[in-house]
């Protein structure tokens, strides 16, 4: 199934890079195919750009920076709000593109379009609130203060699991601040990024302000990191790659924002109803087929309700439908490619070899080679991969704990620190866990925790900086201090 025969607006299906307001082939004619993970069929091709073309994107952004930063904040706001309106108006086509290239169920894709668009609206308005400060002067006859200025060109390297929202969350903040952007989307999911470029052009965003480059990830990323004209780099992806990009950006001393891996604990207190908690845990685990940095990775249940919780979890998990994301009533789509399936299988095999119990998860029922059936393991322990690694698959590992002190130690036993979930109605337990958990975000009695007002980000090896909220735009702003001296006395006659 091709994208073009599924869309009401065929112009949203672009198979070229977008640089300086122009749709661009690769100079050497190199291409790579993009596949539907549900069927394995190619849905299109994209160019592999040459080095000089990537540098040309930086040239375009550099030229556009002069004009874009000179606009008033309310003028940039108007263009971003026009972009927001177009995202909403084209939600169905954008969702279809996303499902075909990424695999997630169509309702989830629609939700991502809404979620991604909401950041455009949020930052369009936040750009008008980049206030400076007035500083009480310690210098006679002087006025002191600060102003906020755009940092410069921002390079945005985005993942395949949320191919639209991870772009808008970064790009809207940067553009609202006055910074042009160069987007490098994941090669598995380029078409969402290119559709965003088409709509940005329609919204009146000037040429060179929003660019999309395509090519071999390591080569393009290295070029962007090495170019001193790029002043900010924002990356969402694995901790391993994030460390590499941080190292590569050191020579040019870039402003670096990293949203990296997660290994979220889901803690269930002894006072919880097992059914309520289990249903919430299933939702936290299996969104996007587990391919989510916020997915519950280690489910830690008090020993007094462990068995009842496992029973309810297995029952709810069994009701999930796995299939092509374009089909109705599908809860889980495919994994992104065969390597992801192989990794999921290896994680399960490792756990079983180390003593875990397979409660459910018959892979013979998978509807295709890129699918992985929801899997439940109990008795998981710290030496297992399912405990130590971000599995990015529909594999749930459950274990029990005795008391709050033990579960805090278990939850913090990881290099990651992005998000944690706590389910309990005991206010003292809530406060104790909230303070003791080493995570950038803690959600209590709610699976949903993110959105435009939220400062999204982690601690430890889960990243640097925050996206969203009132501080998200600061990733793309410099604070300039001024001292106005020799102003004379302001005392009256």
Swiss-Prot record:
It comes from the Bacteria. SUPFAM superfamilies: ALDH-like. PROSITE patterns: ALDEHYDE_DEHYDR_CYS, ALDEHYDE_DEHYDR_GLU. Its EC number is 1.2.1.-. NADP(+) binds at residues 160-161, 184-187, 237-238, 260, 390. Belongs to the aldehyde dehydrogenase family. This is Aspartate-semialdehyde dehydrogenase (Non-phosphorylating). It comes from Halomonas elongata (strain ATCC 33173 / DSM 2581 / NBRC 15536 / NCIMB 2198 / 1H9). The gene is doeC.
């Amino acid at each position: 199934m091709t994208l073009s025969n599924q869309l009401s607006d065929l112009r949203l299906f672009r198979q070229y890079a977008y640089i300086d307001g122009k749709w661009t082939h690769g100079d050497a004619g190199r291409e790579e195919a993009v596949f539907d993970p549900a069927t394995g069929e190619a849905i299109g091709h994209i160019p592999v750009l040459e080095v000089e073309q990537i540098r040309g994107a930086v040239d375009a952004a550099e030229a556009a920076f002069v004009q874009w930063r000179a606009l008033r904040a309310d003028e940039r706001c108007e263009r971003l709000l026009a972009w927001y309106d177009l995202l909403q108006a084209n939600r169905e086509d954008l969702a279809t593109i996303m499902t075909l290239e990424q695999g997630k169920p169509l309702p989830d894709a629609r939700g991502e379009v809404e979620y991604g668009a909401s950041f455009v609206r949020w930052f369009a308005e936040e750009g008008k609130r980049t206030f400076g400060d007035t500083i009480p002067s310690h210098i006679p006859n002087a006025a002191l203060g600060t102003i906020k200025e755009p940092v410069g060109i921002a390079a945005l390297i985005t993942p395949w699991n949320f191919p639209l929202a991870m772009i808008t969350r970064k790009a809207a903040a940067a553009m609202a601040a006055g910074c042009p952007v160069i987007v490098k989307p994941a090669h598995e999911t380029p078409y969402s990024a290119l559709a965003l470029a088409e709509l940005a052009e329609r919204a009146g965003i000037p040429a060179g302000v929003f660019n999309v480059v395509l090519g071999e990830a390591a080569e393009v990323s290295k070029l962007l990191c090495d170019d001193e004209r790029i002043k900010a780099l924002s990356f969402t992806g694995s901790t391993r790659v994030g460390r590499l990009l941080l190292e590569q950006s050191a020579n040019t001393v870039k402003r670096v924002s990293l949203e990296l891996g997660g290994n979220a604990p889901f803690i269930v207190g002894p006072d919880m109803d097992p059914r309520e908690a289990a249903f919430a845990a299933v939702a936290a685990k299996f969104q996007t087929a587990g391919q989510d940095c916020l997915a519950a990775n280690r489910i830690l249940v008090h020993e007094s309700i462990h068995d009842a919780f496992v029973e309810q979890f297995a029952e709810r998990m069994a009701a999930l439908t796995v299939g092509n994301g374009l089909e109705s009533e599908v809860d889980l789509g495919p994994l992104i490619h065969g390597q992801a399936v192989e990794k999921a299988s290896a994680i399960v095999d490792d756990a079983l070899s180390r003593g875990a119990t397979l409660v459910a998860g018959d892979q013979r029922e998978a509807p295709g080679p890129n699918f992985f059936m929801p899997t439940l393991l109990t008795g998981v322990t710290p030496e297992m991969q399912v405990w130590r690694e971000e599995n990015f698959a529909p594999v749930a590992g459950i274990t029990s704990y005795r008391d709050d002190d033990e579960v805090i130690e278990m939850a913090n036993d990881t290099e990651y620190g992005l998000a944690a979930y706590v389910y309990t109605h005991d206010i003292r337990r809530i406060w104790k866990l909230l303070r003791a958990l080493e995570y950038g975000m803690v959600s209590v009695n709610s699976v949903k925790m993110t959105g435009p007002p939220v400062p999204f980000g982690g601690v430890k090896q889960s990243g640097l900086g925050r996206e969203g909220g009132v501080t998200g735009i600061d990733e793309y702003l410099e604070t300039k201090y001024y001292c106005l001296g020799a102003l004379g006395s302001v005392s009256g006659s």
